[in-house]
């Protein structure tokens, strides 16, 4: 059933990409080839688990095709879906090679004797590699990396053909073995071409700290009355894990610095004791990891990975709602860590007692430790945050500009930094200094008055729909043409900038879209306003109309 569903999805995806007005970019021959290497493993709890034979295929699917697959999949399944791609080197893809690749892409199985022959790059699908003309440079930025929370491993450079001819084939890591088999003679102990080999389970290192962002430290965190309690608690936890507050539960509106504090805990704790095993994950990453472990029958490895830790930090714990299996596993993980006197740090956009969609036994455990809330910073703190931002980005700005922005944008740090970035982008596009004149021009009619202005998602959608001469239902729908998709992405961006709504809440306002769709739109438009004058002007004009609108 899964294979049939996946075939329908890929066929629809390719068909949509050929339509002139489609939002989905043209899918190249190379990308079609990678699509045919994909094998569906499971569709569970709103996540499609896909298997590919090597890391280059994983990178292509996630980076260039992920959002398009998510869109088609969600529409077909009748609920929001995300995609989790995993590398499975044991996949037998030889018998299922794509048939729509030009004949000149076929590569012989033997190594030619010509000394200057260069074998196919091991990053490409077996037996063929695209010519330069196959790259879709027109849409190279359409689906930027990072649209979802997956970690993509960059493929290692391939060995030269000369080395391949001079040295016998040796055992390689799983992600490279298949490609190497196409380029060099096989030793007698290696499996025959196309034969399924026994799965070699990759080792997982629970000590790995690659999930921690080194930029998020206590040194770069601006402390004020609005965040002093969670900051003090976080510092104490980092200095003495499991001896101060366990669990530590940090909550507050989106964009106030919860994630920064969690990374700071991990970075400082490992600075004090490099032997500590620290892991930071979002609730979505935890869910994906759990689903993959069930699929691969590797639950014991999963348990070791999350229970053999000194500090476990899970961000946005509220997103475990509706995932009963994941909640069950997290409950047991929580108990195991707490009984072993290991530190647990959680974050959410609301206090534990308001997490009514989670099981009672989880909420009561969250309430057993210290609950620390963060609220919007005061004026002096907002100015300090902007000074730090300007210094970190190497941007020179007059202090009165920072005071102007800080005095008018007080809902969240994200909104504050967004206004600063907008001024910086305007100055960059116009090659102007960042002074009061530039700031006032960039933010003309956009800054709220001293009195609070209530801006809602409905107001933003109404103004955007009118601006682009479409109705609100069309804007909220699933239309893929640029005339509809672009306004929708602009509206999602403005909802993120001008309201305190979380990503899932914004998605609900747009017809139940998944939060990853909102995240993709926010990043895409945020990138475009620094590169495309048309997009920048649209955001300016829409914001002006929204803030001067009397709509309810």
UniProtKB/Swiss-Prot annotation:
Keywords: ATP-binding, Cytoplasm, DNA replication, DNA-binding, Lipid-binding, Nucleotide-binding. Residues 1-90 are annotated as: Domain I, interacts with DnaA modulators. Residues 428-552 are annotated as: Domain IV, binds dsDNA. One of its GO terms (cellular component) is plasma membrane. Residues 155-170 have a biased composition (Low complexity). GO terms for biological process: DNA replication initiation; regulation of DNA replication. Residues 113-213 are annotated as: Disordered. GO terms for molecular function: ATP binding; ATP hydrolysis activity; DNA replication origin binding; lipid binding. ATP binds at residues 255, 257-259. Residues 211-427 are annotated as: Domain III, AAA+ region. It is found in: Cytoplasm. Residues 90-210 are annotated as: Domain II. Plays an essential role in the initiation and regulation of chromosomal replication. ATP-DnaA binds to the origin of replication (oriC) to initiate formation of the DNA replication initiation complex once per cell cycle. Binds the DnaA box (a 9 base pair repeat at the origin) and separates the double-stranded (ds)DNA. Forms a right-handed helical filament on oriC DNA; dsDNA binds to the exterior of the filament while single-stranded (ss)DNA is stabiized in the filament's interior. HAMAP family: DnaA_bact. Oligomerizes as a right-handed, spiral filament on DNA at oriC. Domain I is involved in oligomerization and binding regulators, domain II is flexibile and of varying length in different bacteria, domain III forms the AAA+ region, while domain IV binds dsDNA. This is Chromosomal replication initiator protein DnaA. It comes from Corynebacterium diphtheriae (strain ATCC 700971 / NCTC 13129 / Biotype gravis).
């Amino acid at each position: 059933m899964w294979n049939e569903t996946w075939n329908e999805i890929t066929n629809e995806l390719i068909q949509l990409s050929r339509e002139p007005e489609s939002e989905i970019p043209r899918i190249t021959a190379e990308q079609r080839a990678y699509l045919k290497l994909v094998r569906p493993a499971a569709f569970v709890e709103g996540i499609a688990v896909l298997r590919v034979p090597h890391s280059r295929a994983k990178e292509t699917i996630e980076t260039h095709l992920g959002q398009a697959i998510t869109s088609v999949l969600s529409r077909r399944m009748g609920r929001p879906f995300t995609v989790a791609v995993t590398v499975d080197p044991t996949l037998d893809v030889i018998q299922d090679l794509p048939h729509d690749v030009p004949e000149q892409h076929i590569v012989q199985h033997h190594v030619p004797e010509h000394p200057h022959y260069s074998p196919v790059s091991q990053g490409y699908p077996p037996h063929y590699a695209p010519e330069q003309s196959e790259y879709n440079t027109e849409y190279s930025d359409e689906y930027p990396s990072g649209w979802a929370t997956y970690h993509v491993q960059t493929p290692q450079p391939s060995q030269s053909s000369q080395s391949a001819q001079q040295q016998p084939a040796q055992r390689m890591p799983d992600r490279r073995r298949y490609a190497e088999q196409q380029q060099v003679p096989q030793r007698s102990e290696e499996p025959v071409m196309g034969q399924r080999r026994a799965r070699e389970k990759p080792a997982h290192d629970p000590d790995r700290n690659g999930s921690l962002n080194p930029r998020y430290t206590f040194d770069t965190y601006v402390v004020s009355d609005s965040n002093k309690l969670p900051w003090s608690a976080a510092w104490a936890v980092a200095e003495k894990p499991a001896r101060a507050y366990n669990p530590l539960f940090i909550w507050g509106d989106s964009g106030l610095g919860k994630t920064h504090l969690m990374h700071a805990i991990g970075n400082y704790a490992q600075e004090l004791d490099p032997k500590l095993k620290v892991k930071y994950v979002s609730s979505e990453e935890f869910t994906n990891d759990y689903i993959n472990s069930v699929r691969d029958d590797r639950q014991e490895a999963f348990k070791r990975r999350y229970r053999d830790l000194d500090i476990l930090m899970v961000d946005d714990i509220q997103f475990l709602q509706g995932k009963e299996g994941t909640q069950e596993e997290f409950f047991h993980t929580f108990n195991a860590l707490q009984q072993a006197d290991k530190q647990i740090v959680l974050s959410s956009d609301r206090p534990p007692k308001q997490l009514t969609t989670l099981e009672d036994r989880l909420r009561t455990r969250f309430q057993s430790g210290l609950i620390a809330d963060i609220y919007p910073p005061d004026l002096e703190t907002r100015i300090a945050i902007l000074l730090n931002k300007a210094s970190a980005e190497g941007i020179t700005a007059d202090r009165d500009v920072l005071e102007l922005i800080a005095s008018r944008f007080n809902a969240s740090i994200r909104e504050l930094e967004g206004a600063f970035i907008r001024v910086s982008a305007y100055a960059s596009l116009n090659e102007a200094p960042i002074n009061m004149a530039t700031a006032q021009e960039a933010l003309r009619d956009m800054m709220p008055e001293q009195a609070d202005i209530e801006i809602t998602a409905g107001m933003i959608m109404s103004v955007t729909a009118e601006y682009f001469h479409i109705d609100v239902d069309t804007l909220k729908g699933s239309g893929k043409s640029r005339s509809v998709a672009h306004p929708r992405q602009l509206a999602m961006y403005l909802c993120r900038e001008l309201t305190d709504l979380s990503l899932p809440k914004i998605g609900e306002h747009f017809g139940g879209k998944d939060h990853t769709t909102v995240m993709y739109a926010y990043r895409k438009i945020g990138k475009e306003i620094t590169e495309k004058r048309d997009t920048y002007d649209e955001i300016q004009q829409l914001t002006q109309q929204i803030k001067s609108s009397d709509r309810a």
